[in-house]
Structure formats: structure tokens, C-alpha cells
Amino acid sequence: MEEEIILLDYWASMYGMRTRIALEEKKVKYEYREEDLSNKSPLLLQMNPIHKKIPVLIHEGKPICESIIQVQYIDELWPDTNPILPSDPYQRAQARFWADYIDKKTYVPCKALWSESGEKQEAAKIEFIEVLKTLDSELGDKYYFGGNEFGLVDIAFIGFYSWFRTYEEVANLSIVLEFPKLMAWAQRCLKRESVAKALPDSDKVLKSVSDHRKIILGID
């Protein structure tokens, strides 16, 4: 009998993409439920009463919240298929450090890039570029962030790639030209079926964000 696994998510969420990628890497069957973020479902509010946000992974009726925690949970449940965390304790700690860095350093500036204008957007641009420089340096000449194996840090960051065009268009950023190593890394990740299935089309993301800025925020 198959385990019941439900993912409450939103198609454009780079955080939900992490969980989708992890599930696909492990070849785990699950039920995907799209959430309307302007009218959150009773199930979402019940399963994540503290933060009331996606993604929420529901395993046999039990909720697991926060995407990086979900990815590690999935890796622990199915350790034999495409391991996400390295077996070496130090390397595992390093992977967790960089995943945490991505979470702590990207959320505020990335949201401001598309939801703000003027000085706030300019400040967000500077902050995000510094993050990209740091990650570019950490990647170096490695195939993936952890070396030759696709892992936690790759999963933590690759979802942002689907938003890069949006950041470039709405915030006048130059990411593709300025960070060729990160772009090459993203293309390598996209060759994996799990990533290709999880990441939405960048044009779709741009249109959604542009519509939101114009209609809801009144920003061109």
C-alpha cells in the first residue's frame, strides 16, 4: 500500500520547487495541490497554523513545513535513491550552511526586486548581487555546489533561476551576462528530469509578476 503524500504548493514558488525536485529525485509518488495564495485553503491553514504559507508536505496526515526541512525529511525517508545530503558529516554540515545562507540572504531582497520600486528596489538589487557573487565564488569550477553530485545546495537555489528573467526585466538587473558560471550550473541542473519538471517557464513567471505589479501594486 502506497504512503499518502500530499504537497500544498504554488506553481511559481521557488521554495515549493525544492520539495518537488526532492520528491522527483526520490521517484516518490505524491498528490500535488495548487494553492490560491489570496484565498488559502482550510487544509493549508490547518496544516501550517503558525506561518500559514506554502509549501506544506503532508505525509500520512502529518505536516512538515519549511522547504529545506522538507527536502531533508524526504532524503531521510528514502536514503537509497539519489542521496541529497552527503554521507560525510563535515560535507553535510557545509551543505546545510549554504542552504541556510540562501534562505536567510535571498528572501527579503528577492521579494523587494519585484514588489518595490525606487530606492527600496535599488537597495534590493545591491543586496541580491552580493549574494550572487558569494554563491558564484562558492560554486567556482565545480559541476554542482557539492562537487560532482547534485545535492541540497543545488536544490535550495535552482528554483531562483526561473525568476532570473523577471528580476532582469522588472529591476533592470544583469544576471545572465554577469554570472556565466551560475548560468552554466543552472543549465546542468536543468538536464535533470526532476529540475526540468519542477521549474516553470520564465516567461510565465514574468507575466504573472508583471500583472501583479500593474493590477495590485500599480507598478509598471
UniProtKB/Swiss-Prot annotation:
Domain of life: Eukaryota
All copies of domain GST N-terminal, residue ranges: 3-82
Catalytic activity: RX + glutathione = an S-substituted glutathione + a halide anion + H(+)
Boundaries of every GST C-terminal domain copy: 88-208
EC number(s) given by UniProt: 2.5.1.18
Record keywords: Cytoplasm, Detoxification, Transferase
Single Gene Ontology BP annotation: glutathione metabolic process
Compartmental location: Cytoplasm, Cytosol
Cystine pairs: none
GO cellular component term of the entry, any: cytosol
Gene Ontology molecular function: glutathione transferase activity
Sequence positions that bind glutathione: S13, M14, N39, K40, K53, I54, E66, S67
UniProt similarity note: Belongs to the GST superfamily. Tau family.
PANTHER family listed in its UniProt record: GLUTATHIONE S-TRANSFERASE U23, GLUTATHIONE S-TRANSFERASE, GST, SUPERFAMILY, GST DOMAIN CONTAINING
Protein's job: May be involved in the conjugation of reduced glutathione to a wide number of exogenous and endogenous hydrophobic electrophiles and have a detoxification role against certain herbicides.
Protein name in UniProt: Glutathione S-transferase U23
